[in-house]
């Protein structure tokens, strides 16, 4: 019966995928994570599926090994490569129904990679001969016989990026040999940006589809660190392909990933209109289709639910959302008693971004006068600019200040309407030094995939640069409510050489104004902390925090410039 349907489908004109649409659904097929995987053609009969990604070629460049769990007959070519007659038939069947079929290279478990660009470039010709419209090999020497794929997906997860830009560039050259159809290249980075494995590929090569894994990581869809805006910024500013499409990758069921599963109603809530209506939004991708097919509700299976969500997208009504990164600027001034000269240190930091986030950037400036200083002045200016069509309001945070001979502390707190979990690292300040630290919240997990794997990759995080003292603020994970905690820092008793009246005078002179600005769901929390160092020196620390809903984790602010004037 399937044979007759295949013949009949060849007689019908097929509508090819609209690669520029933002309502496509891409599904991974081949690893049977749902436990009841059907043959490829079964899923292609559904209007909910637009792109099917065969997974995986898990070993390359030599030898080459393919694995499709329960979906291949187990015969081999003369070169020892798995050969699949049923998949070959289904590829052509699906293509004649307007589906795009890609082969994914890599996966969470496998042995693959290149030692240099020359090897990768040569491997592009191997891929073309095996799966493209090439006549260099006999049909019986090709894994899918005479079936011609529509392109390849790079699901590289071993943190080895060498060669992939060269491979993609050479494949583009080979694609031009066949003008009868369109060929595509995809990549499946994990959500931390830039991805350790395909970061260079994404910045150096023309990639059509980016299937971002917003699961198994701290930047999962629905988390306070969901970093769509980081990827949007990549598409707008860094991608060589200005028509690139970003897919929000989700697990198709709770069993399909270690973390990050959201039911259809939650996915619909988290994919806000600014995401759906972005011209760079391509749709939703899923790991994997077998898991999604068995995950049902009253509206159908999970794949059908995802298709219903992306159909709501209207790129012609694209909106702009604004946000800012979490910026921590620390200025420290240390003083010891002596006589008669003064020293002024001034630091200024300005940053501009247009993304929504909850990452942290820290910069620290220290200046010390230990010889002839009777007074010291330090001022810090930090400003963040966002572009938005949303009206703004201003409220003043509540603050409390306490001063004694042993400790001086100031704390401020604000509240807004967003849920954020943020991690902040404050470096220990040492005299006459300039340093900066960046901390990205991490969650490292590893899940292997073998012949019948049930989970797709987990993993990569970005480690923090130097830090000594860490303060972590955790806020409930509800996107509609934010309760910014009050930050208070108390340290050891100041030395006797500095009197309480001196400290009070300097406190009044150096305390910056405290304000809160609400831009959409952005809350700015400015905290002033007085730190007494356990030496004959006193240290003043001022911290500025900006907390937002979506994380732009790549934003890194430059070192603040320091001007020292001696009188």
Swiss-Prot record:
Biological process terms in GO annotation: cellular bud site selection; chitin catabolic process; polysaccharide catabolic process
Catalytic machinery residues: 157 (proton donor)
A cellular component term, taken from the record's GO annotations: cell surface
Location of the protein in the cell: Secreted
Annotated keywords: Carbohydrate metabolism, Chitin degradation, Chitin-binding, Glycoprotein, Glycosidase, Hydrolase, Polysaccharide degradation, Secreted, Signal
GO molecular function: chitin binding; chitinase activity; endochitinase activity
Stretch list, region Disordered: 313-471
EC number(s) reported in the record: 3.2.1.14
Glycosylation sites per record: 159
Main location, first listed in the record: secreted
InterPro entries in UniProt: Cts1-like (IPR045321), Glyco_hydro18_cat (IPR001223), Glyco_hydro_18_chit_AS (IPR001579), Glycoside_hydrolase_SF (IPR017853), Glycosyl_Hydrlase18_Chitinase (IPR050542)
Stretches with biased composition (Low complexity): 319-436, 444-471
Sequence ranges assigned to domain GH18 in this UniProt record: 23-313
UniProt feature coiled coil, ranges: none
Catalysis performed (reactions): Random endo-hydrolysis of N-acetyl-beta-D-glucosaminide (1->4)-beta-linkages in chitin and chitodextrins
Induction annotation: Expression is positively regulated by ACE2. Transcription is greater during growth of the yeast form as compared to the mycelial form, and down-regulated by micafungin treatment.
Gene deletion effect: Leads to strong decrease of secreted chitinase activity, as well as to the clumping or clusterings of cells from early exponential phase.
UniProt family annotation: Belongs to the glycosyl hydrolase 18 family. Chitinase class III subfamily.
Chain's role: Chitinase involved in the remodeling of chitin in the fungal cell wall. Plays a role in cell separation.
Name this protein carries in UniProt: Chitinase 3
Organism annotation: Candida albicans (strain SC5314 / ATCC MYA-2876) (Yeast)
Organism lineage string: Eukaryota, Fungi, Dikarya, Ascomycota, Saccharomycotina
